[in-house]
Regions:
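Alpha-helical interface subdomain recognition
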Residues: 68-206
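Short glycine/proline-enriched turns and hinge-like loops at secondary-structure junctions
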Residues: 6-10, 34, 54, 191
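A short core secondary-structure module
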Residues: 1-24
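A glycine-rich, basic-preceded beta-loop-alpha segment at the flavin cofactor/substrate interface
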Residues: 26, 31, 36-99, 120
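Short, glycine-/Ser/Thr-/acidic-enriched flexible segments
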Residues: 2-4, 20-21, 30, 47, ...
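Short glycine/serine/threonine-biased micro-segments
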Residues: 8, 31, 57, 127, ...
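Structural beta-strand/beta-sheet cores of well-ordered domains, especially the beta-sheet scaffolds
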Residues: 12, 21, 38-43, 183
């Protein structure tokens, strides 16, 4: 039974075979036309006791521990790395990048390196058997905002590039993909608003 004073107590995890009666799976197609996510609905689905994963009643703790692996991975900060790399090469071809452009790119790359270090530190803590829930949430919050802002900056800088510059078409294609995926960055794996709540709770602020 759920303890009213401990609202997360009593949850358990189950392994759910997707071919069970009552399970319906519908594709969620992205704006880019790609398919990475599904909507799953359950209608009177029965799960055997043998399908319990881990400890009965410890589902919430297990899920939050698992999410530390998901939220802190390098994919949370490196989605736009191919775009940034291609853009830097194109700008270098022009040989006329001003101080503002150089400073903007330098700031972005410094943030990327810092985020990578933060991601690696969380991975190290996980490997040592710790559960850095707050740190992992912070990596995803900062990382996904970095990804969105890097697309915006890339679009701004790219607007000044001559269409005849070598590599122009590749950057244009990567930028188009980045624009379509950008809204998704702060949604997948938990919205940033939820993540900030996790961090605030971990710091004793709520």
């Amino acid at each position: 039974p759920v303890d009213p004073d401990r609202r997360h107590a009593g949850f358990s995890q189950f392994i759910v075979p997707t071919d069970l009666p009552g399970i319906s799976i519908s594709s969620i197609v992205l704006m880019s036309g790609e398919h990475h996510f599904n909507e799953v609905t359950f209608d009177e689905v029965f799960i055997e006791d043998d399908n319990v994963l881990g400890e009965i009643g410890a589902g919430w703790q297990q899920v939050t521990a698992e999410l530390s692996f998901e939220r802190s991975g390098p994919e949370r900060i490196l989605t736009t790395a191919p775009l940034l790399t291609a853009l830097i090469r194109v700008l270098a071809e022009q040989h006329d990048a001003d101080d503002h452009t150089a400073a903007a790119l330098g700031d972005l790359l410094a943030r990327l390196i810092s985020l990578r270090q933060l991601s690696v530190s969380v991975a190290r803590a996980l490997a040592d058997g710790h559960s850095p829930v707050n740190e992992a949430a912070l990596v995803k919050d900062l990382g996904t905002r970095f990804e969105q802002e890097s697309v915006e900056l890339a679009a701004d800088l790219f607007s000044y590039v001559d269409t005849q510059t070598p590599g122009y078409d590749r950057v244009a294609a990567l930028l188009e993909v980045g624009r379509l995926h950008s809204p998704l960055f702060t949604l997948r794996g938990g919205t940033n608003e939820v993540l900030r709540g996790v961090v605030a709770r971990g710091m004793g602020l709520r």
